[in-house]
């Protein structure tokens, strides 16, 4: 590389291009003053962004006090010439006159401000500065529309940006100093809110106007691309760069000096700018030229370049290049770029290596070889690259062949003309590409330094593109125009980037982290320092899917807990978790705020005061805002508790009382009983009812109060559940109510609100268990108590998950809500609202708390009409149901009554058998709406009459079991209590258990204890296959034998077979004193005369489980509450009976056959009545 120190004294404005663009007979001068003025202003804004007299004086000196009306003409003419559009004389005159007026008003304000700053206690000075502020504020509000007149927005854009910048500076002064001037707090807050609104309004107007015109210009030809690129470059310098610092005017977010960096690139093409006429005539493709502009990328810095030379018609020219670059902080691997152009060999390669602050200036010698007897060439025959070295004057340069006179400083002027260009330059060469043999230079602003150095006394902003590692799944996308550079985008969970921070000068300084982002979905943002976590917190969405990125789309996320750097060079990893599918996250920059103890205490107090005041509808704290959740109140309480006792004890006590009052108001409006989960199933008539496996746990790092954990279930027919009823007496007619709460994490959690019908949502909320240990601080206090001063979840009511009126909702927010509309109320019906939580999968789980059921708003309009229609439809359905229920109930009651002797329901009819009881039970279960299908433990409108009949069915089963002295006579328990010889089996046939004796040598018997002298009936239902006989014998030790025989040729019988020989046999007359259990031969034999209903062997009294209803055809879980659909006997079965009078206390029942197969359905031995 040839180092040359000559020609450094050539002023850049003494060099000009022979060819200049002509538009409407006028020249576009490459050294237009507005560029220099804008660059000087930008330097001032980036280096002196500190509120106070120094800033406003500098702003006046740079712009408003330095420019004459004729100078403002240049700002208008700059864009006029670029886009070939003239502003009407009246519009021009009005704009210039108003700009001049603003300058004069600003001068008066500056004078008043300086006087007040010198004598802040002087009443007259305070009044004067306040008056001047109000005058110029009103003047800008009134005049700024003159700088965006329809049809002339583009040529007026640069002066619009200057007026907007002035206005935001004035508003910042009033926000920071307003109360000291004598403005009320309300007035200052109003001004601040207006300032935030204006930042977004001014930014969006500038960017939208710029983008619209840029798209209109297009670049079909290379000549068009020249105009397109010049417009892009100069509007970036005069408008977009200034817009990029607008957010820093927010005095509450940036109360101290703020260091910002611009990472966007601008482009120059010496050949295009020199040989405009040639390329215009040749009409080369501008699209191909634009393709040489780099796509969005992580910021890198020029390192080395190898230049190749070719030869054409007696001219040596630059034909190709290869270059390398490095990332910020010299971290990560060196970046090598592929060959651009061609690798010519007409001369040895020429190497250029970056020195110190890089290349700030290039002198080019372009040439054009016409297509005559050879190939046409547009290229460069020589370049001189000049390096910015502050300690060497003149600085060195690298000269490739013969330098020319096309000076890059003409297109990109210095930011400070009071010093030599190598010190006052504004940009550095970052990259070079080629369109054939025509170089295109890429430049970055010098504010973007090669390291991410953290300063101890300023807010340091670091663009995210200054990372050195872009992880898989993350991308760099074109910036929206107001961010000062490109931004990052990620649409899935995972690491985003790793950036290196230089903390060598601030290792003992504590910092807080903020980051500017936009997102279409809630997510969890994590910052790691190597293998250690710095901070992690949930972040709320700022925009909807498909929306264009606007200024208001970007907000600041903040970590409250300060941290220290422990190393000089610190790698920080940025990670995104818990992002919903389809969600998008855009990251602009990360900020480091010095955590001064006093400042932090004041800042925390201000945040706490703002958070507490935001809870209430007015300053008298009489009512809570509707969108303030109970969970949010708890978090505000934590915020107050974490205030410093040393710096603000009195204020802390006052705020604590206000938060307690807010909590009481929250409890009063909450219609749920026991919202704090003091117990479940603790009271039969109120509060929460739920599964026994639900646990109540005390507060943790997420919940301040109790919360519940719902586990999964192994059987979806027996779900985990939690429910409560809101009584009708608590509800207002024609009102919307809202259920809401906070879910720490969940999977397959179903939430229902049930009245006329059910509103249902399934919530899957990703958890953050792995993130709770991220902080370098301990989560617990000295005594093991939770440290609630750790980073907390920032609440934003505008983006909480809320599903209303059929709207779709991404149920991945920890905050959830579900609403329901109530029509007319009827205390007699007491329909109420059921609140139900349910999990019916094995993988399901949930942790939730801070549940609320509150009145939201009266119903009007369409919502009112909708609930009236739903109510009428429900009542019509109920009337039909009542008619059907009456018919079914009558039929079922008659069948149940027929089982018993009388209305006392304590004795069965003598001929009542098991089939009759099952048949009656089936009729009872035809009653509809006995229990809610959503949860079978909640009674429906027919629950009372169902339970009435079902209890009698249960009594019938008990009485039947009590009078049958044979154990397991229906073989539902297999062969329990039966003695077996040979091969026998119990099989399922037609949903019944039957005894099958397939061989003549097999035998089944049971020893039964009886009362001698009493009469018994032996009743057997069986079926004989094939030849031979099936026999059931009853006998004692000494004779007294009788038997029932079954043949295949007999006529079919049924359960209702009545021999006419039986009387009534009440269970109350059973010989309880004769009870015994199975002996060693009859293992499992139980008391045949047990009178306790809970001892029933065959009947399942599972009333605490699930209910059956045959109207829910889509529910495969038959919620039968013990009901078994007992089918009638198939053809071939016969029921036979005989009377037997034992003489001793023991009899034997024996079952066998002679040949074929003998199938026994049931064996009964029933005690007769005395």
Curated annotation (Swiss-Prot):
One of its GO terms (biological process) is sporulation resulting in formation of a cellular spore. InterPro entries: Cry1Ac-like_dom-VII, Cry_V, Galactose-bd-like_sf, Pest_crys, Pest_crys_Cry1Aa_dom-IV, Pest_crys_dom-III, Pest_crys_dom_I, Pest_crys_N_sf. The keyword Endoplasmic reticulum does not apply. Keywords: Sporulation, Toxin, Virulence. One of its GO terms (molecular function) is signaling receptor binding. Transmembrane segments: none annotated. Belongs to the delta endotoxin family. Toxic segment of the protein is located in the N-terminus. Promotes colloidosmotic lysis by binding to the midgut epithelial cells of many lepidopteran larvae. Toxic to Plutella xylostella. This is Pesticidal crystal protein Cry1Jb. The gene is cry1Jb.
């Amino acid at each position: 590389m040839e180092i040359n120190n000559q020609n450094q004294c050539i002023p850049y404005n003494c060099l000009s291009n022979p060819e200049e663009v002509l538009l409407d007979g006028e020249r576009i001068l490459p050294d237009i003053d507005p560029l220099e003025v804008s660059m000087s202003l930008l330097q001032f804004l980036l280096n002196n962004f500190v509120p106070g007299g120094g800033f406003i004086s500098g702003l006046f000196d740079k712009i408003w006090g330095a420019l004459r009306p004729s100078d403002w003409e240049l700002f208008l003419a700059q864009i006029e010439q670029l886009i070939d559009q003239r502003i009407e004389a009246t519009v021009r005159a009005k704009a210039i006159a108003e700009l001049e007026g603003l300058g004069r008003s600003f001068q008066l304000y500056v004078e008043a401000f300086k006087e007040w700053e010198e004598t802040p206690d002087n009443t007259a000075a305070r009044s004067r500065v306040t008056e001047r502020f109000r005058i110029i504020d009103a003047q800008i509000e009134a005049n700024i529309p003159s700088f965006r007149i329809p049809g002339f927005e583009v040529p007026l854009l640069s002066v619009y940006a200057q007026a907007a910048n002035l206005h935001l500076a004035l508003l910042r002064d009033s926000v920071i100093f307003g109360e000291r001037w004598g403005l009320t707090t309300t007035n200052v807050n109003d001004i601040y809110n207006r300032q935030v609104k204006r930042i977004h309004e001014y930014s969006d107007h500038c960017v939208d106007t710029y983008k619209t015109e840029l798209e209109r210009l297009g670049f079909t030809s290379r000549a068009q691309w020249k105009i397109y690129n010049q417009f892009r470059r100069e509007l970036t310098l005069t408008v977009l760069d200034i817009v990029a610092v607008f957010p820093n005017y927010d005095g509450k977010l940036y109360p101290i000096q703020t260091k910002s960096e611009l990472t966007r690139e601008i482009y120059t093409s010496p050949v295009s700018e020199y040989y405009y006429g040639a390329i215009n005539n040749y009409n080369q493709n501008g699209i191909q030229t634009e393709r040489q502009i780099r796509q969005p990328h992580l910021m890198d810095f020029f390192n080395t370049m190898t230049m190749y030379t070719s030869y054409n018609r007696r001219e040596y020219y630059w034909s190709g290049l290869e270059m390398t670059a490095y990332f910020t902080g010299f971290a990560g691997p060196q970046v090598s770029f592929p060959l651009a152009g061609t690798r010519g060999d007409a001369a040895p390669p020429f190497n250029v290596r970056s020195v110190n602050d890089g290349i700030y200036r290039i002198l080019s010698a372009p040439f054009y070889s016409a297509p005559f007897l050879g190939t046409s060439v547009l290229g460069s025959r020589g370049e001189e690259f000049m390096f910015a070295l502050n300690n060497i004057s003149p600085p060195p340069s690298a000269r490739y062949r013969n330098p020319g006179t096309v000076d890059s400083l003409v297109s990109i002027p210095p930011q400070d003309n009071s010093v030599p260009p190598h010190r006052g330059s504004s940009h550095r060469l970052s990259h070079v590409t080629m369109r054939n043999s025509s170089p295109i230079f890429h430049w970055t602003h010098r504010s973007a330094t090669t390291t991410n150095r953290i300063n101890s006394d300023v807010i340091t902003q670091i663009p995210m593109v200054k990372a050195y590692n872009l992880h898989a799944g993350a991308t760099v996308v074109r910036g929206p125009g107001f961010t000062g550079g490109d931004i990052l985008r990620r649409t899935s969970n995972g690491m985003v980037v790793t950036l290196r921070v230089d903390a060598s000068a601030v290792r003992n300084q504590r910092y807080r982290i903020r980051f500017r982002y936009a997102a279409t979905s809630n997510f969890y943002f994590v910052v790691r320092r190597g293998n250690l976590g710095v901070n992690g917190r949930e972040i709320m969405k700022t925009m909807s899917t498909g929306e264009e990125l606007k200024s208001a789309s970007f907000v600041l996320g903040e970590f409250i807990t300060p941290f220290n750097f422990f190393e000089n060079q610190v790698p920080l990893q940025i990670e995104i978790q818990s992002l919903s599918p389809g969600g998008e996250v855009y990251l602009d920059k990360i900020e480091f705020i010095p955590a001064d103890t006093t400042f932090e205490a004041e800042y925390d107090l201000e945040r706490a005061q703002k958070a507490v005041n935001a809870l209430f509808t007015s300053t008298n704290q009489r009512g809570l805002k509707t969108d303030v959740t109970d969970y949010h109140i708890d978090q505000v309480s934590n915020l107050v508790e974490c205030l410093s006792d040393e710096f603000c004890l009195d204020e802390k006590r006052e705020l604590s009382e206000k938060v307690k009052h807010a909590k009481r108001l929250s409890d009063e409006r909450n219609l749920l009983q026991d919202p704090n989960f003091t117990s479940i199933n603790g009271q039969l008539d109120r509060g929460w009812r739920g599964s026994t496996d639900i646990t109540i746990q005390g507060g943790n790092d997420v919940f301040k109060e109790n919360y519940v954990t719902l586990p999964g279930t192994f059987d979806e027919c027996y779900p985990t559940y939690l429910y409560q009823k809101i009584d009708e007496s608590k509800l207002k007619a024609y009102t919307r109510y809202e259920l809401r709460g906070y879910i720490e994490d969940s999977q397959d959690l179903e939430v229902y609100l049930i009245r006329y019908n059910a509103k249902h949502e399934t919530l899957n909320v990703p958890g953050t268990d792995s993130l709770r240990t991220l902080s370098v601080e301990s989560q617990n206090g000295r005594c093991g108590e939770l440290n609630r001063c750790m980073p907390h979840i920032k609440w934003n009511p505008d983006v909480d998950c809320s599903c209303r009126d059929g709207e779709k909702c991404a149920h991945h927010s920890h905050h959830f809500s579900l609403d329901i509309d109530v029509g007319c109320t009827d205390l007699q019906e007491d329909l109420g609202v059921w609140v139900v939580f349910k999990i019916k999968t094995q993988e399901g789980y949930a942790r939730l708390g801070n549940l609320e059921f509150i009145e939201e708003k009266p119903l009007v309009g369409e919502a009112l009409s909708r609930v009236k229609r739903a109510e009428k439809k429900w009542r019509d359905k109920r009337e039909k149901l009542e008619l059907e229920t009456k018919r079914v109930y009558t039929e079922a009651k008659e069948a149940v009554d027929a089982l018993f002797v009388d209305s006392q329901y304590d004795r069965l009819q003598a001929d009542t058998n098991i089939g009759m009881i099952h048949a009656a039970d089936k009729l009872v279960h035809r009653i509809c709406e006995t229990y809610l299908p959503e949860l079978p433990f909640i009674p429906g409108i027919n629950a009372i009459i169902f339970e009435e009949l079902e209890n009698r069915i249960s009594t019938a089963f008990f009485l039947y079991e009590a009078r049958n002295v044979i154990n397991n006579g229906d073989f539902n328990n297999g062969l329990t209590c039966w003695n077996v010889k040979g091969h026998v089996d119990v099989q399922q046939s037609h949903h019944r258990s039957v005894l099958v004796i397939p061989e003549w040598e097999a035998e089944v018997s049971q020893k039964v204890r009886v009362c001698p002298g009493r009469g018994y009936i032996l009743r057997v239902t069986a079926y004989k296959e094939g030849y031979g006989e099936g026999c059931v014998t009853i006998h004692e030790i000494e004779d007294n034998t009788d038997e029932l025989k079954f043949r295949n040729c007999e006529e079919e019988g049924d359960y209702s077979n009545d021999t006419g020989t039986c009387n009534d046999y009440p269970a109350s007359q059973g010989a309880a004193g004769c009870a015994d259990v199975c002996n060693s031969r009859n293992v499992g034999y139980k008391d045949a005369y047990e009178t306790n209903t809970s001892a029933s062997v065959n009947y399942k009294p599972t009333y605490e489980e699930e209910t059956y209803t045959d109207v829910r055809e889509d529910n495969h879980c038959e919620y039968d509450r013990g009901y078994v659909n007992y089918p009638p006997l198939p053809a071939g079965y016969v029921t036979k009976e005989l009377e037997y009078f034992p003489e001793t206390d023991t009899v034997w029942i024996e079952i066998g056959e002679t040949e074929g197969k003998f199938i026994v359905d049931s064996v009964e031995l029933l005690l007769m009545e005395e």
